[in-house]
Amino acid sequence: MDNYLDLMRARREQILERFYAALDRAGRPHDAARLIAVSKTVGVDETVAAIQAGYRHFAENRPQELVRKLTGLAEHPELPEVRFDMIGNLQTNKINAVLGSAELIHSVGSLHLAQAISSRAVRKIEAGELVGPQRVLIEVNVSGEESKGGFSPDEIRAAAGELAELEGICVQGLMTMAPRGQVRMWHAGTFAGLRELRDELEAAHPDLNLPELSCGMSEDFESALEEGSTLVRLGRVVFSPEFAVK
């Protein structure tokens, strides 16, 4: 594990160099975005190494794995405090496992799911089990790929007002994924489309404040940062020794 920790530290320096260079190219300050280490493919030991290497913000795509990581890390009180987000598809029967455990849910892709999260959160707030509304991002299928979930741009335009009124959630922004296997130009267009949609929604709904844009992964995070992403979700480039850092 010592060799893995050394790799993690060296890899983090390389990632941050690229991260800050992308922000510089866009004329954005270095604190304009945050790096999320997606730990969904690794165990608790690897996550501990990532924390020791300097990462403080993590994400999981399955509720049971989120709970497992939090339970495992609780056995390491010597580590600094970290936060976990939920980024994967969330089924309604798993909502209670995520509420209060995930700082931010990135993947609210339907009005039905938003309503379900809100109603469960309200009950937990009333029972004293949750401090306040659950922070969420709305997943938007900007690219229009049939294989991807989320609101279409037209659907989120129609639902934005209702989402803003749900008492148990606080909508913080939007999330999307770029098309699979496409060239960088297409990825940049998807990320720019998310930013433009956010600006449009804020203009149409003054009660909506959407500071967060979650987009960009291991292969395309630099393009995302150049187009305004505030949260990049990096898995393989952080954790996989085999991933080629360009």
Labelled PLM ranges:
Residues 1-221, 225-227, 239:
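Conserved alpha/beta-domain cores
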Residues 106, 229-246:
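Gly/Pro- and small hydrophobic-enriched strand-loop and loop-to-helix capping segments
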